[in-house]
């Protein structure tokens, strides 16, 4: 019931009504009543006054002539006094006492006793029906009276016919009527209170189910209401009256939706209500059509105020009224699916898919016209994808998430074209904003931990195992190579970054120290590095390195412990979600049962192949004959890329593995190898020897120990005879393509890109690990492998940034700018506009704007970063990791706990400054929270668009806190990323995904490539102008710093994944 908790109605109501406004607290038009003077009043005097006022009102009611204005005003005035006296009496009684059977006992509430015994409410209703044009005024006073009695008497009065009968009459007469706003407000408040009472007393539900025919026939005889238009025999009057207000704005709409949700929750307890709502009410079509109408009112183009904007944040929602209404309707639908009866839930999901998702959302995302041509309006595509991303981050109910996943994979509704394929194509868009929004959307999709999505994006291309050579497949489940991969990633750090760390790290005790007076001498350098004259001490990290090589300042830069903690937490979360999958998608050993028959069948296939190509069955032949025949089989065309057929020694036989996937959706078209005992959809992809022979593709076999070759130990499959390489699918091809242009991309695209790959590495799937984390496994895809791309990037950066003094200075400035940006985003997240850093940057901001205009709008990602005063550097660090008396020392465990706590509103952690710093630089779809790391998350986000004149950074969070290495967790989004295992939000909500981008951008120009200005660009021009090197060199320096931090993160993930494998094997 998250909808009920977040309703504004809860803020205005008092504590006694369960969050629902009471009559006296929520009715501003009600006169001020002497509630506090109740104890000073004589109960007998109150009773006499009450009777007198009613007698005077009743004298007016008994007039046969049509009531005049004075008559109505007199009755309303007397009723107002009667309400006052009733309120005084009810406050005087701690508990309402109903009429007692003991005649000698004085009633505890004599006024209320008189009201019920004399049937005053029924008489008042009968007279109100004759008031003509004054009916609304009298009805308003009646509703006030009922509201007061229901709020104070709770459920006791509903059991008495003198109260219930006129209440049902006035509610029935309100159906189909159009009332003024004040009357609508009273009616909705009364209905809300009735729903609360019924929720607490389910046995009273049947009182509000009545036969429409019998009830209305009686009212028709009295001349009260017209006959019903529909032929239904039952009616839940409260629910029917609330339906017209479901899409209303403001507090009236919130109260109506609250009451409707209570009715939906009641349907779980009473099947009659569920049947009525599903079969006889129009709530589901009304919700869906209203949602489609509200979506059509959304802006076709979103104003982008920051160069790194990539997704819609909660603050953006509140700033766009149309988007606020749409999100209210969407969240209400999500809440209905969460609490309603199964019949209502299924009906709403069907209407949502057929009435909103496919006809409304589909064309908007595809951006198609009548001629089925794509629009060239990039802004429309950006806004549509941003809305889709917001929807996926907002809904948390698994059933609703499944409907959206089905929408992405549906091929029948859009003429054979899948939405998911169109989204993948946009990853290659040359437009930076569209590319970032697309990657943010894919970060949200990956954060769902949905098996179907992962199967379509990655696994169906990897399941055949053709990307891994046969001789390497037995390594997939081994543990040791993961540890080696950690070293591999750390070794790929650019040389200039390694040199900078060596210079910044304090010398150990055993190192030789130079003489204190020899200031002009060169310091002792490692043998691997050339000696440099007078190296510049790093300004950004020199003061914050301790003797353990860990960064211990307020920034989380180079904090390996934070990377390890984050990797452990994210991998564990992903593993829990993936446990719900139908298949494990892991390499497994040959099944013991029926193994002999499987081997015999494979041997028979091999003999068929040799018979067709060699004229005989040479499965077991002499060594000479085998060499002569096999050596003559040369490859037709290029080599397949696979290593030679390799026999497995006896000691490795137990490690021989094969991919056995018990799924019907993976390789149905590829698995031609079937047995009576088992069906193997192997890593080879099936295929018989005859089929392979028809391809006529050659293969080679090692002639070493050929007599000892055991065909049954081979991963026999058609890919052994396949020519060329295989594709890893359009998604990975697009990601690898972006990664190959890493040094040419903008900083923000790289942040999203690295975060997206990091999210993939969190999955507990050895198949994905073979691509990302296993440097010892060769990949035979049609594009360079991930590790090859990383090596190429290292070579590019080393070539453009050699280890020189100028390069070290540029690296230091890049690092200082990114860390300063990190601090600024943290301050913005905390709403700390009065921080010393903020005040210090104000004059520099004005100056940098003038310089920026004079320098002709330099378009560089480096130029968008602020370069405020760097951290003061010292030659050595006095930091003691075991010092407990330092008040400024922050507890990582405490910080992490506070960051992981769920909050309904953006609540920046006050005590976790160090642990939440990297969050400021959240990666948009990747959820990466460090300016240098690419950690991704699905639920936390920041809005990074700011006004440069105000200098205030608006950092927004969706309700999930940030982790130690800067990642944010979803709930929810929460947005709950959901989450996210189809648990919305799953839990990642996620609130979540995190936007890792800062407040960056240059001033706006009229050109096509111009980008909006933001806070980062206005504070960096001074130090950039004084920095040596070209613009390209500075951009490469930013890429080098980002790549260095990302490699540390990948090393941490590889190490933690190995720990997970060890734990799984031990268990």
From Swiss-Prot:
This protein's name: FHIP family protein GL19323
Biased composition (Low complexity): 842-858, 893-904, 950-979
Protein family per UniProt: Belongs to the FHIP family.
Disulphide-bonded residues: none
Ranges of Polar residues composition bias in the record: 1-11, 859-878, 918-949, 980-996
Superkingdom of source: Eukaryota
Pfam families registered for this protein in UniProt: DUF5917, KELAA, RAI16-like
Modification Phosphoserine, positions: 508, 835
Taxonomic lineage: Eukaryota, Metazoa, Ecdysozoa, Arthropoda, Hexapoda
Keywords associated with the record: Phosphoprotein
Region annotation Disordered: where it falls in the sequence: 1-31, 503-525, 832-1013
PANTHER family, sorted: FHIP FAMILY PROTEIN CG3558 (PTHR21705:SF11), RAI16 PROTEIN-RELATED (PTHR21705)
């Amino acid at each position: 019931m998250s909808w009920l908790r977040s309703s504004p109605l809860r803020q205005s109501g008092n504590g006694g009504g369960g969050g629902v406004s009471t009559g006296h607290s929520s009715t501003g038009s009600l006169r001020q009543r002497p509630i506090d003077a109740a104890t000073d009043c004589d109960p007998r005097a109150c009773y006499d006054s009450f009777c007198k006022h009613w007698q005077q009102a009743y004298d007016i009611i008994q007039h046969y002539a049509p009531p005049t204005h004075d008559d109505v005003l007199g009755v309303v005035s007397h009723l107002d006094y009667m309400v006052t006296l009733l309120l005084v009496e009810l406050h005087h009684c701690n508990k309402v006492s109903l009429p007692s059977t003991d005649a000698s006992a004085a009633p505890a509430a004599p006024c209320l006793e008189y009201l019920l015994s004399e049937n005053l409410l029924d008489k008042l209703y009968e007279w109100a029906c004759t008031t003509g044009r004054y009916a609304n005024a009298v009805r308003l006073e009646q509703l006030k009276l009922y509201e007061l009695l229901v709020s104070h008497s709770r459920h006791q009065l509903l059991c008495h016919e003198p109260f219930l009968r006129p209440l049902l009459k006035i509610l029935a007469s309100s159906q189909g009527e159009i009332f003024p706003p004040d009357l609508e407000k009273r009616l909705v408040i009364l209905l809300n209170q009735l729903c609360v009472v019924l929720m607490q007393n389910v046995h009273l539900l049947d009182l509000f189910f009545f036969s429409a025919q019998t009830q209305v026939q009686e009212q028709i005889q009295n001349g009260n209401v017209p006959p019903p238009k529909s032929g239904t025999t039952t009616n839940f009057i409260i629910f029917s009256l609330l339906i017209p207000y479901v899409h209303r704005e403001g507090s009236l709409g919130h109260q109506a939706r609250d009451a409707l949700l209570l009715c939906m929750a009641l349907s779980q307890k009473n099947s009659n209500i569920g049947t009525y709502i599903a079969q006889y009410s129009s709530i589901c079509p009304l919700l869906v059509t209203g949602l489609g109408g509200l979506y059509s009112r959304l802006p076709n183009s979103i104003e982008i105020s920051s160069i790194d904007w990539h997704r819609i944040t909660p603050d953006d929602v509140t700033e766009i009224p149309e988007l606020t209404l749409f999100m209210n309707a969407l969240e209400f639908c999500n809440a209905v699916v969460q609490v309603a009866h199964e019949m209502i839930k299924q009906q709403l999901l069907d209407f949502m898919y057929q009435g909103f998702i496919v006809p409304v959302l589909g064309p908007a995302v595809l951006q198609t016209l009548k001629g089925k041509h794509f629009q060239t309006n990039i802004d429309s595509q950006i806004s549509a994808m941003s809305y889709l991303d917001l929807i996926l981050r907002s809904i948390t109910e698994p059933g609703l998430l499944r409907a959206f996943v089905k929408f992405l994979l549906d091929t029948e509704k859009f003429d054979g074209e899948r939405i998911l394929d169109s989204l993948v194509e946009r990853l290659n868009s040359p437009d930076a904003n569209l590319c970032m929004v697309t990657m943010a959307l894919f970060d949200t999709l990956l954060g769902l931990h949905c098996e179907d999505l992962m199967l379509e994006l990655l696994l169906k291309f990897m399941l055949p195992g053709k990307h891994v050579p046969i001789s390497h497949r037995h390594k997939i489940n081994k543990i040791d190579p993961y540890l080696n991969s950690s070293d591999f990633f750390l070794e790929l750090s650019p040389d200039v970054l390694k040199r900078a760390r060596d210079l910044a790290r304090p010398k150990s005790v055993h190192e030789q120290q130079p003489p204190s007076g020899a200031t002009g001498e060169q310091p002792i350098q490692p043998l691997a590095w050339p000696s440099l004259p007078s190296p510049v001490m790093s300004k950004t990290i020199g003061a914050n390195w301790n003797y353990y090589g860990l960064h211990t300042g307020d920034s989380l830069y180079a904090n390996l412990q934070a990377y390890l903690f984050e990797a452990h937490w994210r991998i564990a979360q992903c593993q829990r979600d993936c446990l719900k999958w139908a298949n494990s998608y892991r390499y497994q050993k040959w099944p013991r049962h029926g193994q002999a028959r499987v081997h015999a069948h494979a041997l028979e296939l091999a003999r068929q192949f040799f018979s067709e190509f060699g004229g005989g069955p040479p499965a077991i032949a002499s060594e000479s004959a085998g060499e002569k025949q096999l050596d003559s089989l040369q490859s037709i065309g290029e080599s397949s890329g696979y290593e030679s057929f390799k026999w497995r020694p006896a000691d490795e036989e137990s490690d021989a593995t094969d991919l056995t996937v018990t799924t019907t959706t993976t390789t149905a078209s590829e698995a031609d190898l079937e047995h009576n005992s088992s069906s193997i959809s192997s890593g080879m992809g099936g295929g018989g020897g005859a089929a392979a022979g028809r391809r006529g593709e050659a293969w080679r076999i090692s002639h070493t120990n050929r007599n000892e070759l055991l065909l049954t130990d081979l991963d026999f499959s058609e890919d052994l005879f396949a020519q060329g390489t295989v594709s890893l699918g359009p998604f990975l091809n697009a990601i690898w393509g972006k990664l190959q242009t890493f040094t040419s991309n903008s900083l923000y695209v790289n942040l999203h890109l690295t975060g997206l790959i990091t999210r993939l590495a969190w999955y507990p799937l050895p198949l994905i690990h073979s691509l990302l984390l296993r440097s010892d496994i060769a990949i035979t895809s049609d594009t360079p492998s991930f590790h090859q791309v990383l090596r190429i990037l290292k070579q590019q950066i080393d070539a453009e940034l050699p280890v020189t003094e100028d390069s070290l200075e540029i690296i230091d400035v890049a690092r200082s700018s990114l860390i300063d940006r990190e601090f600024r985003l943290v301050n913005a997240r905390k709403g700390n506009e009065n921080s010393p850093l903020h005040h210090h940057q104000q004059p520099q901001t004005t100056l940098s704007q003038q310089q920026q205009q004079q320098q002709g709008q330099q378009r560089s990602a480096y130029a968008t970063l602020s370069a405020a005063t760097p951290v003061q550097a010292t030659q050595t660090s006095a930091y003691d990791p075991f010092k407990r008396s330092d008040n400024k020392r922050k507890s990582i465990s405490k910080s992490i706990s506070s960051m992981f706590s769920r909050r309904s509103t953006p609540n920046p952690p006050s005590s976790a400054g160090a642990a939440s710093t990297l969050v400021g630089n959240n990666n948009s779809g990747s959820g990466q929270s460090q300016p240098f790391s690419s950690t991704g998350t699905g639920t936390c986000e920041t809005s990074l668009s700011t006004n440069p004149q105000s200098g205030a950074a608006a950092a927004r969070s969706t309700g999930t806190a940030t982790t130690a290495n800067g990642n944010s967790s979803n709930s929810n989004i929460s947005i709950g990323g959901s989450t996210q295992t189809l648990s919305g939000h799953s839990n990642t909500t996620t609130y979540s995904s995190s936007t890792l981008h800062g407040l960056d951008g240059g001033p706006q120009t009229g050109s096509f490539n111009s980008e909006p200005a933001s806070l980062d660009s206005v504070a960096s021009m001074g130090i950039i102008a004084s920095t040596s090197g070209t613009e390209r060199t500075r951009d490469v320096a930013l890429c080098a710093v980002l790549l260095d931090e990302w490699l540390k993160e990948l090393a941490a993930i590889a190490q933690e994944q190995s720990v997970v494998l060890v734990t799984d094997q031990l268990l």
